[in-house]
Regions:
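Pepsin/retropepsin-fold aspartyl endopeptidases
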Residues: 1-182
Length: 182
């Protein structure tokens, strides 16, 4: 289940992903617009980075990223307020001896979990590089539920997604299209 946050002018609510199998979701953060259309062909979008995705559990978007030479399993979660990484990713990045700040992550069920928040190395998504993002690392329940505790994993939340100008999720074609601010 995805949550459309308040960036859409107060249109906060739950968007069920189960019915999106043949759809394309266009989110224009710059103009506070969202549209859900039938996916009828390739996205012809100038200025976008195209990233192939795999769907897990029917709607969880998984794709390749690189952080300081580490290639974690990455997921996009429009229902997550913050970006989180599992302890395996933190260990893989441990050669960077940065000290983080203890933080609390509150899940959709209002369970609170402790983590360590720190500035992550640049994240490469295709030909797009994101810098200066904060990630909270820890043994979060979501990684256990998705059986991703033993391998580095990163869940990219709205703190990062919302910095983009636009995002297109094409469930039928299994593609993610990102446009960075100009």
């Amino acid at each position: 289940v995805a949550i459309v946050p308040d960036v859409f002018g107060g249109a906060e609510g739950v968007l069920g992903a189960d019915g999106l199998g043949d759809k394309r979701v266009n989110i224009d953060f710059k103009n506070d617009q969202i549209s859900i259309l039938r996916s009828t062909g390739p996205v012809r979008a100038n200025g976008f980075t195209r990233i192939p995705v795999k769907l897990r559990y029917g709607h969880l978007l998984m794709f390749d990223v690189t952080l300081a030479g580490v290639r974690p399993r990455a997921m996009l979660d429009t229902g997550a307020q913050s970006t989180i990484g599992n302890s395996s990713l933190r260990a893989a990045l441990a050669r960077r001896k940065r000290q983080g700040v203890e933080n609390i992550i509150i899940g959709v069920t209002l369970d609170a979990q402790k983590g360590e928040t720190l500035l992550a190395p640049a994240v490469e998504l295709g030909d797009l590089t994101l810098r200066g993002m904060q990630v909270t690392f820890g043994d979060m329940y979501i990684f256990e539920a998705w059986k991703m505790t033993d391998t580095p994993a990163l869940l990219i939340g709205m703190d990062i997604i919302g910095l983009l100008d636009s995002l297109i999720i094409d469930y039928k074609r299994r593609e993610l299209h990102l446009r960075a601010p100009r």
